[in-house]
């Protein structure tokens, strides 16, 4: 079987709540780290989410 082109990554909240989203990205086309402004239900606000590895 071939190696998959997309890898799973974790988007971790910068509010230090421990909340995260899991998404996929293609490392060949998106070489920089992802950063999104998404909703964190723990603090009930939109905060920045940064990319981290899934362990």
From Swiss-Prot:
This is Large ribosomal subunit protein bL33. GO terms for cellular component: cytosolic large ribosomal subunit. Keywords: Ribonucleoprotein, Ribosomal protein. Disulfide bonds: none annotated. Gene3D superfamilies: Ribosomal protein L33. GO terms for biological process: translation. GO terms for molecular function: structural constituent of ribosome. InterPro entries: Ribosomal_bL33, Ribosomal_bL33_CS, Ribosomal_bL33_sf, Ribosomal_zn-bd. Belongs to the bacterial ribosomal protein bL33 family. It holds the Pfam family Ribosomal_L33. PROSITE patterns: RIBOSOMAL_L33.
